[in-house]
Amino acid sequence: MAVQLLEDWLLKEQEKIVTTYRELNQAPLKEPGLIFIGDSIVEYFPIHELLQSPKHMVNRGVRGYKTDLLRKHLDAHVFGTVVDQIFLLIGTNDIGKEIPQKETLDNVEAVLQAIMRDFPLTHINLISVLPVSQEERYKQKVYVRTNEKIQALNQAYQELAQAYHQVSYVDVYSSLLDEVGQLAEAYTTDGLHLSVAGYRILAQALQEIV
């Protein structure tokens, strides 16, 4: 019962955010040059504080997002006429909900193909799913996610990106690991989400290409 209530609440929150994005997309003061799309790790990414670019940056992340929802609502996330690059970071919630990898890949490929069709001059950066900390104290938040599952999905992402000249795979996973192969303590708030220090590492990896 409690889990269902939480799911219902999250769905309503997601719908509110998507509605807001659609409204904002109608009359932007500036056309977006760089768009960041994905789940909560994107939504909470302070791009304007940690990244520098002459291009106008827009964040269109949504907490709790799975790949099927991004596919369904893609028009709320990608907009404009002068989009230079799109940064896509998504997949950890698919793992958390035990969605089959093939289904995740089908959704991501559909998203990539839709963007390439509508934005043929836009480059897409498919960012690796980030590692988690599998320490016992984070179990409730991390749930069934494991770095083994994440690495398997990242390998599939890398292969998917190689199939399209308009897509690049960006490995951030490796930069966030500690000496035992877990998401480093300094880089996380709860074993899953990033701390400011973690976002600095993410920003460093992306700064070279923004």
Report the location of each language-model feature.
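Histidine-centered active-site loop/cap adjacent to the catalytic His
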Residues: 70, 188-210
